[in-house]
Amino acid sequence: MKLIILDRDGVINQDRDDFVKSVDEWIPVEGSMDAVAFLTQAGYTVAVATNQSGIGRKYFTVQNLTEMHAKMHRLVRQAGGEINGIWFCPHTDADNCNCRKPKPGMIEDIIGRFNAQASETWLVGDSLRDLQAIDAVGGKPALVLTGKGKKTLSQHGHELPEHTQVFDTLLDFSQYIMQENTAPQAD
């Protein structure tokens, strides 16, 4: 099982300081739909792991989130890709749950659900907490510089997990993965 986990806000869609609260505010990052299509076509299972504390803060509802995710699914399919599952944490930091990144609960659940190997699983995110969550299970962290990624790199570059790879966009990450898949293997 080849699994890639994507953070949502700032990676797949544009992020907002005041939360993405509705389907109209959910706007894809340029190239992200094609990136998911490339990953799908390369044989990867693609899952989304997203903290959505706006639900816990009552900024939007689960129904609003469902509508945003329906739009994301539709646009990804139109590009020729597939998202095989979406996991979200509705809690705030004060709830002290195990699913809110950087805690690894959501990531462990995804890896278990797809019977994947943590050490072979990528997580692409734009925040330190995304990278810490995949690092906690022994996976492969990738930072993209969209969303909060540039700020994360400048303010937390010294704290990134040791094997973090940095890409400008999700599309750049997907092209790297496709090159890795087509590179000749050593005997």
Curated annotation (Swiss-Prot):
<keyword id="KW-0862">Zinc</keyword>
<keyword id="KW-0378">Hydrolase</keyword>
<comment type="similarity">
    <text>Belongs to the GmhB family.</text>
</comment>
<feature type="active site" description="Proton donor">
    <location>
        <position position="9"/>
    </location>
</feature>
<feature type="binding site">
    <location>
        <position position="91"/>
    </location>
    <ligand>
        <name>Zn(2+)</name>
    </ligand>
</feature>
<comment type="pathway">
    <text>Nucleotide-sugar biosynthesis; ADP-L-glycero-beta-D-manno-heptose biosynthesis; ADP-L-glycero-beta-D-manno-heptose from D-glycero-beta-D-manno-heptose 7-phosphate: step 2/4.</text>
</comment>
<dbReference type="GO" id="GO:0097171">
    <property type="term" value="P:ADP-L-glycero-beta-D-manno-heptose biosynthetic process"/>
</dbReference>
<dbReference type="GO" id="GO:0009103">
    <property type="term" value="P:lipopolysaccharide biosynthetic process"/>
</dbReference>
<feature type="binding site">
    <location>
        <position position="126"/>
    </location>
    <ligand>
        <name>Mg(2+)</name>
    </ligand>
</feature>
<feature type="binding site">
    <location>
        <begin position="7"/>
        <end position="9"/>
    </location>
    <ligand>
        <name>substrate</name>
    </ligand>
</feature>
<feature type="binding site">
    <location>
        <begin position="50"/>
        <end position="53"/>
    </location>
    <ligand>
        <name>substrate</name>
    </ligand>
</feature>
<feature type="site" description="Stabilizes the phosphoryl group">
    <location>
        <position position="50"/>
    </location>
</feature>
<feature type="active site" description="Nucleophile">
    <location>
        <position position="7"/>
    </location>
</feature>
<feature type="binding site">
    <location>
        <position position="97"/>
    </location>
    <ligand>
        <name>Zn(2+)</name>
    </ligand>
</feature>
<feature type="binding site">
    <location>
        <position position="99"/>
    </location>
    <ligand>
        <name>Zn(2+)</name>
    </ligand>
</feature>
<feature type="site" description="Stabilizes the phosphoryl group">
    <location>
        <position position="101"/>
    </location>
</feature>
<dbReference type="Pfam" id="PF00702">
    <property type="entry name" value="Hydrolase"/>
</dbReference>
<dbReference type="InterPro" id="IPR006543">
    <property type="entry name" value="Histidinol-phos"/>
</dbReference>
<comment type="pathway">
    <text>Bacterial outer membrane biogenesis; LOS core biosynthesis.</text>
</comment>
<keyword id="KW-0963">Cytoplasm</keyword>
<dbReference type="GO" id="GO:0005737">
    <property type="term" value="C:cytoplasm"/>
</dbReference>
<dbReference type="InterPro" id="IPR004446">
    <property type="entry name" value="Heptose_bisP_phosphatase"/>
</dbReference>
<feature type="binding site">
    <location>
        <position position="7"/>
    </location>
    <ligand>
        <name>Mg(2+)</name>
    </ligand>
</feature>
<comment type="subunit">
    <text>Monomer.</text>
</comment>
<keyword id="KW-0460">Magnesium</keyword>
<feature type="binding site">
    <location>
        <begin position="100"/>
        <end position="101"/>
    </location>
    <ligand>
        <name>substrate</name>
    </ligand>
</feature>
<dbReference type="GO" id="GO:0008270">
    <property type="term" value="F:zinc ion binding"/>
</dbReference>
<feature type="site" description="Contributes to substrate recognition">
    <location>
        <position position="100"/>
    </location>
</feature>
<feature type="binding site">
    <location>
        <begin position="15"/>
        <end position="19"/>
    </location>
    <ligand>
        <name>substrate</name>
    </ligand>
</feature>
<dbReference type="GO" id="GO:0034200">
    <property type="term" value="F:D-glycero-beta-D-manno-heptose 1,7-bisphosphate 7-phosphatase activity"/>
</dbReference>
<protein>
    <recommendedName>
        <fullName>D-glycero-beta-D-manno-heptose-1,7-bisphosphate 7-phosphatase</fullName>
        <ecNumber>3.1.3.82</ecNumber>
    </recommendedName>
</protein>
<dbReference type="InterPro" id="IPR023214">
    <property type="entry name" value="HAD_sf"/>
</dbReference>
<dbReference type="GO" id="GO:0000287">
    <property type="term" value="F:magnesium ion binding"/>
</dbReference>
<feature type="binding site">
    <location>
        <position position="9"/>
    </location>
    <ligand>
        <name>Mg(2+)</name>
    </ligand>
</feature>
<dbReference type="InterPro" id="IPR006549">
    <property type="entry name" value="HAD-SF_hydro_IIIA"/>
</dbReference>
<dbReference type="InterPro" id="IPR036412">
    <property type="entry name" value="HAD-like_sf"/>
</dbReference>
<feature type="binding site">
    <location>
        <position position="89"/>
    </location>
    <ligand>
        <name>Zn(2+)</name>
    </ligand>
</feature>
<keyword id="KW-0119">Carbohydrate metabolism</keyword>
<keyword id="KW-0479">Metal-binding</keyword>
